[in-house]
A protein has these predicted regions:
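Hydrophobic anchor at the beta1->P-loop junction of P-loop NTPases
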Residues: 7
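P-loop (Walker A) phosphate-binding loop of NTP-binding proteins
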Residues: 10
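ATP-dependent small-molecule kinase phosphotransfer cores
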Residues: 29-129
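Hydrophobic positions on the alpha1 helix immediately C-terminal to the Walker A/P-loop
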Residues: 18
Length: 217
């Protein structure tokens, strides 16, 4: 089997920028790898995810139902697009994965049920659906003040373009708490991406990511 390394983080943390940097670095090193990203909006398997984020199921959709929407998208992607590469031993670098359910949907669950939700998620995605467990996960920890500013810039100041999750700052604060909770339980690497209202340089974060990836390349 190959190695599956997952980069996750809240919206506006700089995942896309860092993936560009990592792609260039790994290519220059001659590393044979496959890059994947979730949700896979270009595929029909993401249809329910799109409806959920557009608010078509309301703002109180069951976190178990929402988790299933994302999980099915990942299952389809694995079976159709990267299972062969993974089983052939290739390095897979994922932007988001099962880990996002352990952030966004955990945050939508009562805090006293967090351990039970994570137990359910592990059994559902890895055992029942048969998705590969990540070999390593890093969480890009960008201060919310910075990520909100970056998202506003991304949408040219049009707040209406933000999805169900992106526009709820209080929810995103809980998402960060959930991410750090999952990180502690599952041994994720947390990479700070800024301090206060200032982001760290792109290069500094890339160096931290490459150090994290070193055992797999």
């Amino acid at each position: 089997m190959g190695k599956l390394c997952v980069i996750d983080g809240l919206d506006g943390c700089g995942k896309s920028t860092q993936l560009e940097q990592i792609r260039a670095r790994l290519a220059a090193m001659g590393v044979d790898f496959r890059e994947i990203s979730f949700p896979d909006y270009e595929q029909p398997s993401s249809a329910l995810v799109k409806q959920y984020l557009a608010g078509e199921f309301g703002e109180d959709a069951s976190p178990f139902a929402a988790s299933s929407f994302y999980a099915v998208d990942r299952y389809a992607s694995f079976q159709k697009f990267w299972k062969e590469d993974y089983e052939a031993g290739k390095l897979i670098v994922a932007a988001r994965y099962t880990t996002s359910n352990a952030i966004y949907q955990l945050a939508r669950s009562p805090r006293e049920t967090w351990d039970a939700f994570l137990d359910w998620m592990e059994d559902y995605e890895y055992e029942k659906l048969g998705l590969p467990r990540p070999d390593a996960v890093c969480f890009l920890d960008m201060p919310l003040a910075v990520s909100q500013r970056l998202m506003t810039e991304r949408y040219d100041g049009d707040e209406s373009k933000k999805d169900l999750h992106e526009r709820n700052v209080k929810f995103l604060e809980t998402c960060r708490e959930a991410a750090l909770y999952a990180a502690k339980r599952w041994g994720w690497t947390v990479i700070p991406c800024g301090e206060g209202d200032k982001p760290f340089s792109i290069e500094a974060v890339t160096e931290s990511l490459m150090e994290w990836l070193k055992p797999f390349v």
